[in-house]
Design a protein with these regions (language model features):
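Accessory RNA-recognition modules of RNA-modification enzymes
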Residues: 1-234
């Protein structure tokens, strides 16, 4: 469905729900609704013939639907994930099997800075030991010199959660920074940060404008992620 048609359908739904209570304004859409997502996750596995695959789970199963690229994901993230598949084969690293609990390599999480261009790669393993980790990191950085930090995250639990508690920084600072509405934010692997930077800036700007703040308000920034709304509004 074309993006403009999607907006029309959303507008109809919003009008239907809110018409009894208030007037509605026109939805503010994106100028370019492609490759905007700054957080990309891929689960790793293998086919019966041993071919390494990555993608997303089919709903309600542990069956991996292979994904090479997605129209809403940052192109750099998709390219990094594809190349990691090849590196696993080269380094003979086994992927994790959710059903049996055997294997090592589980997920990859890539976070990108919309304005800064910084790139974080998180390798999620079932064990704290990545074979030949120095050479693996060098090989990945050679393929993608745009990467600013690489993190090894350990998740050895049988869970649908992607990230575990323990992390080791393999390269870089262990975080990236990005700008949102003129403010610089530090983003870690586990930070809650809006995935669509362009629309987030439009949303926050409009919300703050409509709030009519005087500077005398006191804000309780509960459930705030990394505090973007409160900090920008202040």
């Amino acid at each position: 469905m074309p993006y403009e048609e999607q907006l029309k359908q959303k507008q109809k739904q919003v009008n239907k729900l809110l018409k009894p209570y208030c007037n509605t304004e026109k939805i503010i859409g994106m100028e370019n609704p492609f490759h905007y997502r700054n957080k990309v996750h891929a689960v790793f596995g293998h086919r019966k013939d041993g071919t390494v695959i990555s993608g997303i789970y089919q709903q309600g199963t542990h069956f991996i639907v292979p994904v090479d690229e997605c129209l809403i994901e940052d192109k750099r993230a998709d390219a990094i994930i594809r190349d990691i598949r090849d590196l696993l084969k080269s380094f003979k690293i086994k992927t994790y099997n959710e059903d049996t609990g055997y294997g090592l390599f589980r997920h990859v999480l890539v976070r990108t800075g919309h304005h800064s261009g910084q790139v974080m790669v998180v390798l999620v393993l079932g064990s704290p030991i990545l074979p030949s980790n120095n050479n693996f990191v060098k090989a990945l950085r050679k393929l993608h010199p745009e990467i600013t930090t690489i993190i090894l995250n350990v998740n050895n639990q049988k869970t649908s959660m992607i990230l575990g508690e323990k992390e080791t920084v393999l390269y870089g600072k262990g975080y990236i920074e990005d700008e949102l509405c003129g403010h610089i934010f530090r983003i870690s692997s586990k930070s809650f940060y809006q995935v669509n930077t362009a629309q987030t800036e439009k949303l926050y700007t409009k919300a703050i404008e409509l709030a009519g703040l005087t500077g005398k308000e006191r804000v309780i920034d509960a459930y705030c992620g990394i505090g973007t709304i409160g900090l920008i509004a202040s």
